[in-house]
Amino acid sequence: MRVVGVEQDQREFAEFYAAAWDDCLRIVMVGVGDRALAEDLVAEAFTRAWASWRKVGGFAEPRAWVIRCALNAHVSWWRRHRREVALGSHDTTAATSQDPGLDTSLVAALRRLPVRQRQVIALRLLLDLDTATTAEMLGMSGSTVTTHLHRACVALRRDIPARNDQERVQ
C-alpha cells in the first residue's frame, strides 16, 4: 500500500516541477544574475523539496518554498566562495541576454537594486505572492515589504526611463 503513496507523491512532484521550474528559475536569476548558478541553485532547491515533499507539497505556496530555499542556498554559496571571486570576473549581462522572456535592460535595472528590494520585486510581482506570504518568506513585516516594493518601483521608474532616453539620443 505504501507503493501507491510513493507513486502519488512522484506524480504530484513531477507535475509541480514541470509547472514551477521556469518561474523559480527566472525569479532566482533576478536575484543572482547568473543563469548557470541560478540553475544549480534551483536544482538543489527542487532536490530538497523532493526529499521533504510530503511536508512541502502541503504548503499553500510550494513554489515560494523552493525559491526561498534556492535564495538561501545562494547566500551559503556566496559565503563559501566570496574569497575566490575576483571583482568583474564575469559578465552577467551575457548570461541573461540569451534567455527568452527576459528584457536585458530590466534585468540590469533590477540588478542595481539592493538585494531585499530585488527579492520583494521577484516575489510580489513576478511570482504574484501577497504581502503577508512575501513577508513571511523574507522574515520581515508586511509594512517593510510594502516599503521595499515602493522604493524599488520608484528606483526602476527613475532608472528605466533614463535608459530609454539615452537610447533615443544615440
Report each predicted region and the residues it spans.
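C-terminal edge and immediately downstream basic/flexible tail or linker adjoining helix-turn-helix-like DNA-binding
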Residues: M1-E7, E12, M137, C153-Q170
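A short, charge-rich alpha-helical start-of-domain segment used by transcription regulators
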Residues: R2-L25, A36-V42
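C-terminal flanking helix
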Residues: W21, L25, F46, P114, ...
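Short, small-hydrophobic-rich alpha-helical interface motif
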Residues: C24, V28, A38-A49, C69, ...
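Arg/Lys-rich amphipathic alpha helix in sigma70-family domain 2
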Residues: A51-G58, I67-S89, Q98-D99, A162
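Internal acidic/polar
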Residues: S76, R83-L110, D130, D165-V169
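Helix-turn-helix DNA-binding module
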Residues: R111, V115, L127-T147, V154-R158
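A short pre-motif secondary-structure segment
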Residues: V120-R124
